[in-house]
Amino acid sequence: MKSKFIVIEGLEGAGKTSVIQQIITILHSNGIHNIISTRDPGGTPLAETIRDIIKKGMNGEYITDYTELLLLYAARTQLVAQVIKPALMSGTWVISDRYDLSSQAYQGGGRGIDIRLLQNLRDAALGKFYPDLTIYLDLPPSKCRARIRARGIPLDRIEMESLSFFQRTSIRYRELVANDSRIITIDAQQSIAELNATIRNNIERWLKSQQK
């Protein structure tokens, strides 16, 4: 089977990291071992530096919404060019913690940036390069915030946003995933056992569909 690009999406605290590890295990059990995982923003030295600015700020300087948006796309285009596309061309599967859907939801919903502008920027920066599969972990913003705060570590610049910010982001996520057949929505409120079973069933069903 040709190498694939899989993305895990969701709000902070939705459980993306655990699901990525589970998907890697599922792929291994299906004979797929040549896999790398990455994150967006991040994944290259330059993109990781940009990630730090987005997450931590820059010596207290105010970061405008459009500056944040352009930083995200700078990091993303670097990740695609330096990591994702070369890996896929070499036969390696790629699993990413976030990709472009995050900007469409966070910047379009949370920040309120014009949706058409975001779509045009996406097309200009990434062309027609889309994930083969996106898993969206749907969890209410209030529960995501509770999980984040339960970690007991300082919140980053994004995690400190208001509940209404994450509610707007969640609404936009749901609008986006409802119109794309390449995205599978998973109810992340399930128990760990139920969530694991749902992930496995969906991934294995998708793998079978790719073999046709």
Swiss-Prot record:
Q: Which GO terms describe its biological process?
A: dTDP biosynthetic process; dTTP biosynthetic process; dUDP biosynthetic process
**One Pfam family recorded for the sequence:** Thymidylate_kin
Enumerate the residues binding ATP.
10-17
Q: Which UniProt keywords apply?
A: ATP-binding, Kinase, Nucleotide biosynthesis, Nucleotide-binding, Transferase
Q: Does the keyword Calcium apply?
A: no
Q: Give GO cellular component annotations, separated by semicolons.
A: cytosol
The UniProt record lists the EC number as 2.7.4.9
Catalyses which reaction? dTMP + ATP = dTDP + ADP
Q: Which InterPro entries does its entry note? A: P-loop_NTPase (IPR027417), Thymidylate_kin-like_dom (IPR039430), Thymidylate_kin_CS (IPR018095), Thymidylate_kinase (IPR018094)
Q: Which CDD domains match?
A: TMPK
GO molecular function, one example?
Answer: dTMP kinase activity
The answer on whether this UniProt entry bears the keyword Transferase reads: yes
Q: By its UniProt entry, which PANTHER family does this protein fall under?
A: THYMIDYLATE KINASE, UMP-CMP KINASE 2, MITOCHONDRIAL
Q: What family does the database annotate?
A: Belongs to the thymidylate kinase family.
General function of this protein: Phosphorylation of dTMP to form dTDP in both de novo and salvage pathways of dTTP synthesis.
- List the protein's name: Thymidylate kinase
Which gene is annotated as encoding this protein in its UniProt record? tmk
